[in-house]
Amino acid sequence: MRSPIMQTGLDFTLVEDLVAGVDEVGRGPLCGAVVTAAVILDPARPILGLNDSKKLTEARREKLYVEIQEKALCWFIARAEVEEIDQLNILHATMLAMKRAVEGLSITPKLALIDGNRCPQLSVPSAPVVKGDSRVPAIAAASILAKVSRDREMAAFELIYPGYGIGGHKGYPTPVHLEALARLGPTPIHRRSFAPVRAAHEARASIMIGGSIPLPVGLLQD
């Protein structure tokens, strides 16, 4: 008999007492924090429509975001900041943020199911689930909490750092973002350890040293 984790589609036999689903959003972007969430669903209060957050419309994610927070036994949203990403690298920063999410739960889970192929070091048993956000309801719920939280933050950064299109691409290396990065230089929320940001930073620093053009205030902060 196949393990329920290996079955295709969301498997609601995995909505068990004290099983936490954990997911992240924001490993690939050039700016902003990596955001994680951990969720323990309540078997007595099912949530219809759970799925990988990337497969849902923004409006549907927003509705489920509220419903998950209302119906889950517990949930916690955590993060690793840009400075931690640059210091640790994105993989280790993601593992740290996942650990913070699990440790932040008000109820200690019996098991943590982690989206992906590796687990952070936790004080509770854990197991990775490849494509877990499409297969395990609690991981799907975690993916929704993490994505909505991060997307809202990116929308706020659009107002603070206009001209980069952050509210649209959410920090991912789209042509619009890369062009703005080359033209305007990195902001304090850009990840200096990522090659496109580092290249833009070095190019703007070189121009500043050469005295060719004035730079916008605050764009070359470390």
From Swiss-Prot:
Classification via InterPro entries: RNase_HII (IPR022898), RNase_HII/HIII (IPR001352), RNase_HII/HIII_dom (IPR024567), RNaseH-like_sf (IPR012337), RNaseH_sf (IPR036397)
Entry keywords, A to Z: Cytoplasm, Endonuclease, Hydrolase, Manganese, Metal-binding, Nuclease
HAMAP family attached to this UniProt entry: RNase_HII_B
Gene3D superfamilies: Ribonuclease H-like superfamily/Ribonuclease H (3.30.420.10)
Organism placement in taxonomy: Bacteria, Pseudomonadati, Pseudomonadota, Gammaproteobacteria, Pseudomonadales
Co-factor binding comment: Manganese or magnesium. Binds 1 divalent metal ion per monomer in the absence of substrate. May bind a second metal ion after substrate binding.
Sites where the protein binds a divalent metal cation: 23-24, 115
Name of the coding gene: rnhB
Organism superkingdom: Bacteria
GO molecular function: manganese ion binding; RNA binding; RNA-DNA hybrid ribonuclease activity
Protein known as: Ribonuclease HII
Reactions mediated catalytically: Endonucleolytic cleavage to 5'-phosphomonoester
Required cofactor(s): Mn(2+); Mg(2+)
Record function comment: Endonuclease that specifically degrades the RNA of RNA-DNA hybrids.
Class of the enzyme per the UniProt entry, highest EC level: hydrolase
Localization: Cytoplasm
Family: Belongs to the RNase HII family.
Residue span(s) of domain RNase H type-2: 17-206
Pfam families reported for this sequence: RNase_HII
GO CC, one annotated term: ribonuclease H2 complex
Its EC number(s): 3.1.26.4
Protein species of origin: Pseudomonas savastanoi pv. phaseolicola (strain 1448A / Race 6)
Keyword Magnesium included in the entry's annotation: no
Biological processes, Gene Ontology terms: DNA replication, removal of RNA primer; mismatch repair
PROSITE patterns: RNASE_H_2 (PS51975)
